From Swiss-Prot:
Signal peptide positions (record): none
Regions crossing the membrane: 29-52, 61-82, 104-123, 143-161, 199-222, 240-262, 276-295
Protein name (database record): Olfactory receptor 2J3
Keywords (A to Z) from UniProt: Cell membrane, Disulfide bond, G-protein coupled receptor, Glycoprotein, Membrane, Olfaction, Receptor, Sensory transduction, Transducer, Transmembrane, Transmembrane helix
Impact reported for residue 226 to Q: In allele 6M1-3*02; decreased response to C3HEX
Keyword Methyltransferase: no
Gene Ontology cellular component terms for the protein in this record: plasma membrane
Main localization category: membrane
Disulfide cross-links: 100-192
Extracellular side: 1-28, 83-103, 162-198, 263-275
Gene from which this protein is expressed: OR2J3
Protein's cellular compartments: Cell membrane
One example GO MF annotation: G protein-coupled receptor activity
Residues carrying covalently attached carbohydrate according to the record: 8
Length: 311
């Protein structure tokens, strides 16, 4: 503890993740639900990664980016869900200071990367529908790899900024994080000093990595809709709307909860409401992405048949 009463969490060695302790009667139910969705996430996303690697028909930009998204979702959920399951299962709800730093860094990094990657995926669909004759030039494999690397680098760079700013803030007295994982708004609530600079930085970068990507995605799909409406083929219309509709659903399931959490000051959030919103985009959305992208996809169904030897 400092002379002025402020606590450096590293000297204490741990944080207490309050999580859903206020509803002990719900913890078993939440544990079962979270475990089911986590297993769905692991199975569904591993399935997409393996299938995209094994089937040559899926060696296209769309499935390259989808494999990146699947790997991203695997990492994103694994950065917080195992800790949540441990806390829900038993009375021990602590996380080490180093563990909290690592978790905060990866949750932020992977979440930001997903925002950028979804923009890249929308651009790929725009190029495929609106610029079909130039698609192979626009989405050259080398350029696709560059876009994927840029997505990951931007996410991890942004996270380094926020993580360092957050853990420089001195804490006051207690170490109870009113959340189920280490997150910037929840950690800023522990501070006894003015955190307006941190909150402003969070809102600015959230606008850059949430609002701007969302605008770019909606612009891409707006152009796609206009191009599709000019098509004469009913089959083409159904195929394009089916693919783009699935992408937009995945975008909505990720961006809407993220905006509710990060585009307002930590003091403006209902803490309990924030937990359930975060539970949705860290548990539910990653498990639904494989279903959304592949459920009605004839190319994926064909790849499965070839892999199983049914064709």
């Amino acid at each position: 503890m400092n002379d002025d009463g402020k606590v450096n969490a590293s000297s204490e060695g741990y944080f207490i993740l309050v999580g859903f302790s206020n509803w002990p009667h719900l913890e078993v139910v939440i544990f079962v639900v979270v475990l089911i969705f986590y297993l769905m996430t692991l199975i569904g996303n591993l399935f997409i990664i393996i299938l995209s690697y094994l089937d040559s028909h899926l060696h296209t930009p769309m499935y390259f980016f989808l494999s990146n998204l699947s790997f991203l979702d695997l990492c994103y959920t694994t950065s917080s869900i195992p800790q949540l399951l441990v806390n829900l299962w038993g009375p021990e709800k602590t996380i080490s200071y180093a563990g909290c730093m690592i978790q905060l860094y990866f949750v932020l990094a992977l979440g930001t990367t997903e925002c950028v990657l979804l923009v890249v995926m929308s651009y790929d669909r725009y190029a495929a529908v609106c610029r079909p004759l130039h698609y192979t030039v626009l989405m050259h494999p080398r350029f696709c790899h560059l876009l994927a690397v840029a997505s990951w680098v931007s996410g991890f760079t942004n996270s380094a900024l926020h993580s360092s700013f957050t853990f420089w803030v001195p804490l006051c007295g207690h170490r109870q994080v009113d959340h189920f994982f280490c997150e910037v708004p929840a950690l800023l609530r522990l501070s006894c000093v003015d955190t307006h600079v941190n909150e402003l930085t969070l809102m600015i970068t959230s606008s850059i990595f949430v609002l701007i990507p969302l605008i770019l995605i909606l612009t891409s799909y707006g152009a796609i809709v206009r191009a599709v409406l000019r098509m004469q083929s009913t089959t083409g219309l159904q195929k394009v709307f089916g693919t783009c509709g699935a992408h937009l659903m995945a975008v909505s399931l990720f961006f809407i909860p993220a905006m509710c959490i990060y585009l307002q000051p930590p003091s403006g959030n209902s803490q309990d409401q924030g937990k359930f919103i975060a539970l949705f985009y860290t548990v539910v959305t990653p498990s639904l992405n494989p279903l959304i992208y592949t459920l009605r996809n004839k190319v994926v169904r064909g790849a499965v048949k070839r892999l199983m030897g049914w064709e």
